[in-house]
Amino acid sequence: MSRIYGMAKMAYQAIRPFRERQMACRVCNYYKDSTDREVLEVLEYIKKNKTMKSFNYPFAEKYRHYRCPLRKDRKSGLFLTKYHGHQMYFSRDFFTSSACVNYMRSILTEQDPESPHRYLTDSFDVDEGSVVVDAGAAEGNFSLDILEKASKLILVECNRNWLEALVKTFAKEIAVGKVEIVPKLLGDHDDHSHVSIDFLYQKYGKIDFIKLDIEGGEENALRGGVKWMRECPAAKLAVCAYHKPDAFHYIWQMLENQNLFHLSYTKGYMYFPAVINDQPPYLRRGLIRAVRRQQVNRSYE
């Protein structure tokens, strides 16, 4: 396995610089007539560096050589690190230290205060005592960041390898009932592998904040949460809007049609590389933030 992994990694590393340069040229050509200042800022960075990354801004450079402290749990065999003062486990998919380090670099980059992927800000945050749904929990970094603020955390994650890691990361909180893990995909219906926002709302009686980062399933998840959106006066949402080319438009329209929310989006653009064939728009907004209008008594970014 390690030999196959090593060969695959070498092949990917060999082709990656070419692909990044190719995409840099394609993106610059696609946006050559743009007058959007934020687009022009990205293009300037791309032209200067002659490459295309997910985050084409100077802030990303400070994590390029970041090294996180790692150790291996003897009992489970999983790698773990310290994340903002908390122990955080990696899934079994990360079976080399270099893979763990690269993953941590990506987490820190996407949650940098200047990142288009940043979930929270000083003015858009989880309130003390909130019940929070972390959909697409993965390694659990979002939940760890708000662990002290939230009264309850509901982690929705369908990847079995991440489930094992999450149970280790949140063992103490699970034991006292502060954290519950739902091993399903958040969607617009309920069955053995899917769960809806409205089902969780009915089960727990209160949900104040939902983070949606579910690899393109955000629209379906919102369709399954109409009752919650209409009935919860404290509702807040942080919704990833870049996984599909048209995601931003549809998610914004869906939330706007509810006529309930103050909507905003994160500053800047990010590039989300497709597995097979990249489709425009190549530069996409990272997140849409939604706050029930009753709560808007101050400025949200």
Predicted regions and their residues:
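Conserved beta-strand signature within the Rossmann-like core of class I S-adenosyl-L-methionine
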Residues: 210, 233-242
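Short, conserved loop/helix-junction motifs that constitute active-site signature segments
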Residues: 127, 146-149, 173, 204, ...
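S-adenosyl-L-methionine
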Residues: 1-149, 154-156, 159-204, 248, 261-301
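Active-site beta-loop-alpha junctions enriched in small/polar residues
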Residues: 187, 242-244, 268
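A short acidic, amphipathic alpha-helical/loop segment
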Residues: 145-149, 169, 221-228, 250-254
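Conserved S-adenosyl-L-methionine
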Residues: 136, 211-215
